């Protein structure tokens, strides 16, 4: 079964073996508003936990996308680059940002489960 975890920067990550899918949360899209541009990391690039892995721009603001764990980018979701509005309609499923091969699964331990993330989002107001 795939496990979904959440970061304090409002990214979600779904683990499947040693690969993971990363995107932004529904809460993030609500804060950003209508998404108009997405920039994703290059396939084959290495990313580090909490490092910048792209940009999402909305009618309200531009925000960096951070990777919740370290790894190598193995796939990008070109569909959201071509049509950024898809991120608003289904941010936690079809509008994933990138897939990566994880180099250190223990980094998942510092992330939140759904209940913890919902509490964090409510309490932080961010």
Curated annotation (Swiss-Prot):
Subunit description: The glycine cleavage system is composed of four proteins: P, T, L and H.
Origin species: Pelagibacter ubique (strain HTCC1062)
Top-level taxon of the source organism: Bacteria
CC annotations in GO: cytosol; glycine cleavage complex
Transmembrane annotation, as ranges: none
CDD domains to which the protein is assigned, alphabetical: GCS_H
Record Pfam families: GCV_H
Its biological purpose: The glycine cleavage system catalyzes the degradation of glycine. The H protein shuttles the methylamine group of glycine from the P protein to the T protein.
Name this polypeptide is given: Glycine cleavage system H protein
Modified residues annotated as N6-lipoyllysine in this record: 60
Similarity comment: family membership: Belongs to the GcvH family.
Cofactor (UniProt): (R)-lipoate
Start and end residues of each Lipoyl-binding domain: 19-101
Cofactor binding mode and count: Binds 1 lipoyl cofactor covalently.
GO biological process, one term: glycine decarboxylation via glycine cleavage system
Assigned keywords, A-Z: Lipoyl
């Amino acid at each position: 079964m795939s496990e979904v975890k959440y970061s304090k920067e409002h990214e979600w990550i779904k683990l499947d073996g040693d690969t993971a899918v990363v995107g932004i949360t529904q809460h993030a899209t609500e804060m950003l508003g209508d998404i108009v541009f997405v920039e994703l990391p290059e396939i084959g690039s290495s990313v580090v936990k909490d490092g910048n892995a792209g940009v999402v721009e909305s009618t309200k603001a531009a925000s960096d996308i951070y990777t919740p764990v370290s790894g190598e980018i193995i796939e990008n979701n070109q569909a959201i680059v071509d049509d950024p509005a898809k991120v608003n309609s289904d941010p936690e499923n079809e509008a994933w940002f990138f897939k990566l091969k994880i180099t250190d699964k223990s980094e998942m331990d510092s992330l939140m489960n759904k209940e913890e993330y919902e509490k964090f989002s409510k309490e932080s107001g961010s």
